[in-house]
A protein has these predicted regions:
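Intrinsic disorder/low-complexity segments
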Residues: 1-65
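Mature catalytic core of soluble alpha/beta enzymes
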Residues: 3, 10, 29, 37, ...
């Protein structure tokens, strides 16, 4: 296989749940090409061909650039072109819900796929308008503003996500709790990151306001309410998964059967990429950027990863990250990374967060108890725990870095 062919094979057969928010879009094409060459070298070094389930961790917008680099390389080398009748990979990306949404489909009809993609992207935007805490007038903004007073009308979609969040809360003993948003403003890990570590005097008054059981959903009336003033809901830990599930339904209704939808650390893979399953990778939590420690082939399944290495800051040698334990109001300290495989991305999105907070042994016990759920946990001590259903399926490429 030529270098150009290997590059094309790598890009077209791989997917990772670790593509996060758009950044570095101005990186030069030369650096992109170097990254591809480096990736091919890594594959050869560990005895893997590029068809193995690994890929570069990069913003989704860069995936398109990398693909262009490789296509140009193939042309320069005189590689064969794909006929219009032959199936191939169609890919598009758009920013929604604060991150890059990437959709790929293996199909013979590019025009029909792109039309379906647009409908799926529009659904992300529609749900964002309902669930965002940043948009005035959204269902969640109105729910938060009315906390401790009256129930407010909310859409059926928001009620479905709230019901799903409460189910995951029950499974995890409250470790996953969308009312953790009562802590908002104390910790800053997004564009407003400032390295401030709130003290107990700041955190303690907020903790009684975190209680998923004080969230009431009335499907008959079409309303939701929060019992106490100061309570807040944030669906950032489950909303993207729900949006992916909705997008999957749209793509299937459009007649697509082989596709992948990805938003941040969450994805759903339907069917296959040609004659192979889709391949996903798990990032090494303490490794260099773009380094994976494990990989997995999946089909017709959801996959989500939560980790302490994306949104964080270091102060006085201690890592502070965005996954907060609702019992302490501080960053959870028992895990480095949790990946969950299940049938629904709504479930994998919320459960990966809840299991991350539970930690290794308790989290794995929950995974083993839940039907149709598998998982991989990298504990705070850097132990790798693999659920029974993934043993023999998960390819561990290296030990996670210390």
């Amino acid at each position: 296989m030529s270098c150009a062919d290997e590059c094309l094979e790598f890009l077209s057969t791989s997917a990772t749940s670790e593509i996060e928010e758009r950044h570095g879009a101005q990186e030069s094409c030369h650096r992109q090409a170097d990254a591809v060459k480096r990736r091919v070298t890594e594959c050869r070094a560990v005895g893997l061909r590029s068809v193995q389930p690994r890929r570069l961790k990069a913003p989704c917008n860069i995936v398109v650039i990398l693909a262009s680099v490789c296509l140009l390389a193939a042309s320069a080398c005189g590689g064969p072109s794909r006929s219009k009748e032959a199936p191939g990979l169609v890919e598009r990306s758009r920013v929604s819900m604060g991150t890059e949404v990437h959709i790929s489909a293996w199909t013979t009809d590019e025009a029909a796929a792109v039309t379906a993609f647009d409908k799926a992207f529009n659904e992300f935007d529609r749900l964002d308008a309902l669930m965002s805490t940043w948009k005035a007038g959204s269902d969640i903004t109105r729910l938060n503003d009315a906390a401790g007073t009256v129930a407010v009308p909310v859409s059926v979609e928001v009620r479905e996500v709230l019901h799903a969040s409460q189910e995951v809360s029950e499974w995890t003993g409250g470790k996953f709790d969308v009312t953790f948003a009562a802590l908002s403003g104390l910790w800053k890990f997004d564009h407003d990151i400032d390295g401030h570590v709130p003290d107990r005097a700041e955190i303690a008054p907020r903790l009684p306001l975190i209680d998923y059981r004080a969230l009431t959903i009335d499907d008959r009336a079409g309303t939701a309410s929060l019992a106490r003033a100061g309570m807040k809901v944030n669906l950032g830990g489950i909303g993207k998964g729900y949006a992916i599930d909705r997008a999957v339904s749209i793509l299937r209704d459009a007649g697509l059967s082989d596709f992948l939808v990805q938003s941040g650390g969450d994805l759903f893979a339907a069917g296959k990429r040609g004659d192979r399953p889709w391949r996903v990778g798990i990032q090494d939590p303490r490794g260099a950027p773009d380094t994976l420690f494990a990989a997995l082939e999946i089909t017709d399944a959801a996959f989500s990863t939560s980790g302490d290495y994306e949104r964080f800051f270091i102060r006085d040698g201690h890592r502070y990250h965005h996954i907060l334990d609702p019992d302490t109001g501080e960053p959870a300290a028992r895990s480095r990374s949790v990946s969950i495989l299940a049938k629904s991305t709504t479930v994998t999105d919320g459960l990966s967060t809840g299991v991350f907070i539970l930690g290794g042994d308790e989290g794995m016990a929950l995974i083993e108890k839940l039907p149709d759920v598998e998982g991989v946990i990298v504990t705070a001590e850097n132990r790798v725990l693999v659920s029974s259903g993934l043993k023999g399926r998960l390819v561990q490429l290296k030990a996670p870095s210390e």
